[in-house]
Design a protein with these regions (language model features):
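All-alpha prenyltransferase/terpene-synthase fold signal
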Residues: 1-258
Length: 258
């Protein structure tokens, strides 16, 4: 079976999202949904989903609806996070945030619609397993955001396992669901998925100078990121499959500069 490179997988995701048909009931709101989707995100979560899918024997195209659903949930979270009631950010990826470009009420509705569209995609499979996986991840992400908003940051690892880690874990879990991997064979894959969110978040904090970096210092935070990357690579080495593309993705997560 063909294995795509991370860049090729990202190209598949971009094409799929660009051609994705939203519900006609949304009318002109579709423009607002596409605005944050087309703002140049890295697509790390859907690329991971496709790479895991290929590693367990599925075709990348088979996993595209699930991968796109992940990106829609992630984008929904960004649109809502930027609102004045939460992070109050006026800019996202070098452009005005959705609430600045279209108004708070419209941005709120766009986020709601992105979430609904994500579940429409997840429910396009014969089994409901993908939708259940996505629901659990979304609830975890929201729970982590609640901790952040209410200032419950005493346990950063627990917060980030929810806020960031749940969608990364779902990148793996959704691929396993779509490929119908037997539950008894899922444990090493899920152990790998559990490492990814923390790795991503620590590197994020090093780049932004907050979170782990602010609490422990930049050098110590960088060491934590290296340890997280080593754990993720170790999890991959324990999996009896061709995980070379995933190893490349993990290395990219650990060394990213933006």
């Amino acid at each position: 079976m063909r294995r795509h490179s991370p860049d090729a997988l990202r190209g598949l995701v971009e094409s799929y999202l660009g051609e994705l048909a939203f519900a006609p009931e949304l009318g002109a709101l579709e423009e607002v949904l596409r605005y944050p989707l087309e703002s140049g995100g890295k697509r790390i979560r859907p690329v991971l989903c496709l790479a895991v899918g290929e590693a367990v024997g599925a075709e990348a195209e088979q996993c595209l609806p699930a991968a796109a659903a992940l990106e829609l949930v992630h984008t929904f979270s960004l649109v809502h996070d930027d609102l004045p009631a939460l992070d109050d950010d006026d800019e996202r990826r070098g452009r005005p945030s959705a609430h600045v470009a279209f108004g708070e009420g419209v941005a709120l509705l766009a986020g709601d619609a992105l979430l609904a569209e994500a579940f429409r995609l997840a429910l396009s499979y014969p089994s409901t397993a993908a939708a259940r996986e996505l629901a659990q991840a979304t609830l975890g992400m929201i729970g982590g955001q609640y901790r952040d908003v209410t200032g419950d940051t005493s346990d950063l690892a627990a917060l980030h396992r929810l806020k960031t880690g749940c969608l990364f874990a779902a990148s793996v879990g959704l691929a396993l669901s779509v490929a119908e991997v037997a539950e008894r064979e899922q444990a090493p894959w899920r152990a790998f998925g559990a490492e990814l969110g923390l790795l991503f978040q620590i590197v994020d904090d090093v780049l932004d100078g907050d979170g782990y970096s602010e609490r422990h210092g930049a050098e110590a935070a960088r060491a934590l990121a290296d340890e997280a990357a080593a754990r993720a690579q170790g999890r991959l080495e324990a999996i009896p499959a061709d995980t070379s593309v995933l190893a490349e993705i993990v290395a990219g997560l650990a060394s990213r500069t933006a």
